[in-house]
Amino acid sequence: MSQVTFSDVAIDFSHEEWACLDSAQRDLYKDVMVQNYENLVSVGLSVTKPYVIMLLEDGKEPWMMEKKLSKAYPFPLSHSVPASVNFGFSALFEHCSEVTEIFELSELCVFWVLHFLSNSPNSTVEAFSRSKKKKKKKKKRQCFAFLIYFRLGIKMGKQGIINKEGYLYEDSPQPVTMEKVVKQSYEFSNSNKNLEYTECDTFRSTFHSKSTLSEPQNNSAEGNSHKYDILKKNLSKKSVIKSERINGGKKLLNSNKSGAAFNQSKSLTLPQTCNREKIYTCSECGKAFGKQSILSRHWRIHTGEKPYECRECGKTFSHGSSLTRHQISHSGEKPYKCIECGKAFSHGSSLTNHQSTHTGEKPYECMNCGKSFSRVSLLIQHLRIHTQEKRYECRICGKAFIHSSSLIHHQKSHTGEKPYECRECGKAFCCSSHLTQHQRIHSMKKKYECNKCLKVFSSFSFLVQHQSIHTEEKPFEV
């Protein structure tokens, strides 16, 4: 089952869109983005810190990333297999055996993508619409080009470019439904059933900054000459934003079936981070990271370390940003108010979560059982039920738990701590849920009272039986 990524819950704003937001809406956006990232980090689903999070933590505006990121120039890919053949990503490794890890931004032909979409009917995608720009001198037929982001994709190929005839388009990104993309793709396939596709020669996406793309060299081991028509167009700014994720230690994707390679001249400068190996590996779960600092933050998931302590209440946190958000609760300030019921919240993300109770919207659906959730964090917690993953282990007895809250409750059994005391009888409990359950005993005792003798019963049926004594009725007499 595919994992949730930060991009599944991320929202991108252009400079113009950001300018339309007021200060409260911007604060809400920042809170939601940071909380979603921390939720993913807490369960080990986010490997590198997204650039937008770094900007937000530095107090910068998120649209500034558009200026920093590099431009992308993918080149075409095609296949000789007809559309009726069932493609899968296993076939990709047959064509490109050296593949060890695929970029989140990679190039796919139309049939690869159609197969992937058909096997992920619940995925949501973002696509680039067809460009209206056409070169007058070139009469080559220009096709659709979609930059697809697979919301619930597999670990490899989470993003891809559909290039049906080997040409790339540039236009403003428009979010569309998967159904619309599939419909357009199938319309193209049905109207071009007799098209011939050449064998897969290469599968590579490369990114560079302030440079031009050189023509690939024809160094095929089979001696075949391959001519690549590359449109030197820039992806729109939002697509460039997506390409930022390659700078987190991802490996370049190479193919040994073709000798085609980019000319390593001054005209092409690749970021060093693209070729960097993931050398920092977690000894507990085997996950690899590009930076020692990221591994250190990840390690806190296993150790339970919470180095950031609140001076007001002593509560500890694993991340500094979590402590900052927590400290707002002590100030008593609640600037985020629900327009439906008037309830106020100290964090914008809390308001967002609360508003789902009014709308009833549950957009996050479990692929295993179909259960839906209003928040992605709830879905992540639920998924552990299916995987039976128990990542929270007690250091004292070794017992493992699915949820961190269960571990916290369990640890109190070792310490003997019972902070929850009943006001009625003084009995103490280690968990608030146990106290709530106990308090029902007191409330039930005072619930049903006989108006004749003032005797109290814990249930209505007992009261009815008792009242038969006063009326001299014998309801159970044969």
From Swiss-Prot:
Entry's transmembrane regions: none
Cited SMART domains: KRAB, ZnF_C2H2
Chain ranges of the KRAB domain: 4-75
Keyword Mitochondrion: no
Zinc finger (C2H2-type): 280-302, 308-330, 336-358, 364-386, 392-414, 420-442, 448-470
Keywords: DNA-binding, Isopeptide bond, Metal-binding, Nucleus, Repeat, Transcription, Transcription regulation, Ubl conjugation, Zinc, Zinc-finger
Chief localization: nucleus
Covalent cross-link Glycyl lysine isopeptide (Lys-Gly) (interchain with G-Cter in SUMO2) as placed by the record, residue numbers: 183
GO terms for biological process, alphabetical: regulation of transcription by RNA polymerase II
Subcellular location: Nucleus
Keyword Nucleotide-binding: no
GO cellular component, one term: nucleus
Database matches in InterPro entries: KRAB, KRAB_dom_sf, Znf_C2H2_sf, Znf_C2H2_type
Primary role: May be involved in transcriptional regulation.
Family membership: Belongs to the krueppel C2H2-type zinc-finger protein family.
PANTHER family according to UniProt: ZINC FINGER PROTEIN, ZINC FINGER PROTEIN 566
Protein name per Swiss-Prot or TrEMBL: Zinc finger protein 302
Organism: Homo sapiens
